[in-house]
Amino acid sequence: EIGVRLVGSEMCIRDRNEAGYFKDADDKKCLCKAYSYEPFYMAYETKDGGKEQYNDVIGQYNAMNDELFADTKYSSDTTAKVKVLSVYAASLIDTMEVMDQMIYEIYRKMQDYFKASVKAVLETGRDYDDFDDFDEESELMFAYAVLKGCRMKALHTEKYEGIVLGVCDKVMAGEIFTDDDTDKNVVSKAALVYSETVRNREYQDYGRGKGGALWS
């Protein structure tokens, strides 16, 4: 626990790229690091950091959002576009889950970014009726982000949940990973989707006195 708090307290001085958000070991821009770091950073600030760096977190998302949509707008690689948008959406909803929702301006800004990223995936022209032309990692990450967004009421359940229920069915039936040779990233993302399918999707408990939002 002490080690976790030490790492959390040093997040605000962790190296950034020229755009202002966390970079990878090769100084490259990498949204996978956002997915790794930002939810942890926000959780630390909510519980132990006094929420002093909330503005830093949203500042990084502002920078990421501007770059992401500038890059994907002109990208002809739809597969790569879908993957990065799906990871970005998952990063946002996981960060929203652990922040104090009463800091409404920041929460709402992140919700706007989240909804825009989900919409952007759906506008890529991919077939999301059965997701047959998605790679498995993107399919799973997008389904996870949408399911969690619906549960947290960041998305309209009636409009979005049905889009990804087929992915849930494939996970439950073992169609996405069926043997020991399946990539570990696919297995871990399938586990995330499964975790959302078994949650109570009708009830939410916002724990104001417990450091943030505790979604059932």
Residue ranges and their predicted role:
Residues F177-S216:
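Terminal, non-catalytic domain-edge segments
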Residues R16-T79, K83-L85:
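Aromatic- and glycine-enriched pocket-lining scaffold segments that form the walls
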Residues I106-M141, K148-D179, R208-S216:
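Non-catalytic carbohydrate-binding regions of carbohydrate-active enzymes
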Residues E1-G8, C12-I13:
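Single conserved hydrophobic/aromatic residue that forms the stacking wall/gate
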Residues S36-G50, V87-E105, M141-L155, K189-Q204:
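Well-ordered alpha-helical scaffold segments within catalytic/enzyme domains
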Residues N17-E18, L68, M99, G125, ...:
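A general structural signal marking secondary-structure boundaries and capping sites
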Residues A43, K47, D56-A70, D94, ...:
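Alpha-helical scaffold segments in carbohydrate-active enzymes
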Residues Y21-A34, T72-A90, Q101, I106-M110, ...:
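Solvent-exposed loop and edge beta-strand segments that line ligand/cofactor-binding
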